[in-house]
Amino acid sequence: VGSEMCIRDRCKVEHDRLNALPDTVNRQQMLWGINQGATFKDLRIWHMKEIAKLDLPGYAIGGLAVGEPTEVMYEIIEAVEPYMPKDRPRYLMGVGTPSNIIESVARGVDFFDCVMPARNARHAKLFTWQGSINLKNAKYTRDDGPIDPQCVCPVCRRYSRAYLHHLFKAEEMLAMRLSVMHNLYFYNTLTRRIRDSLDTGTFGDFRAEYSQKLAEKI
């Protein structure tokens, strides 16, 4: 072996070198440590301990939500979280459903990314505070109610379930656009309500009320 420095260390050295160059375009870009190890808790913990030594600005848990049971994902988060620096943001990659987000916050995760709001919307699957719905279902043919009676997004204020059902059946592009708008609004509202409940010390109540409910299909 020509060098004892592993790829993990080289990444930080190279990142620091590039940021030190006078013509670097954006010195605000950050290098984060991404925890891996599949569903093996011992490998996950070992890896988290190693990347924590690099003193990076943030840490992520990667390689989950790729087909393993949800409970296994939660077990991995619980195993890794104690070894993540307490003063750095924790990022769970590629997650997830509204229930996944609530349960992961309860386990110490700070933020997320996921295509689910947009991807599901394109297939007529929309999120509401009562659970998820599929607007292609025949029962919405003459449903004049909004997507979600509790939602105040522009779509819910102006359009009915029946109208969006018609748009999907007619294969109109507008159906997907309106549905994506609603789902993104829902996710923004969800995360805002989570933050508010954490600030007021009521997250436990919020979790008890919505974690299971939002996982249901109605």
Regions found by a protein language model. Give the residues of each.
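Short, small-residue-biased leader/transition segments that mark boundaries at the very start
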Residues: 1-7
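Surface-exposed helix-capping loop/turn segments at secondary-structure junctions
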Residues: 15-27, 88, 194-206
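Acidic/glycine-rich phosphate/pyrophosphate-binding loops and surrounding catalytic core
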Residues: 11-18, 46
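Residue-level signal for well-ordered alpha-helical scaffold segments within enzymatic catalytic domains
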Residues: 13, 54, 79-82, 166, ...
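C-terminal extensions of enzymes
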Residues: 148-218
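Secreted/extracellular small peptides and ectodomain modules produced from precursors
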Residues: 4, 112, 151-154
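Glycine-rich phosphate/ribose-binding loops and adjacent secondary-structure elements
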Residues: 21, 26-147
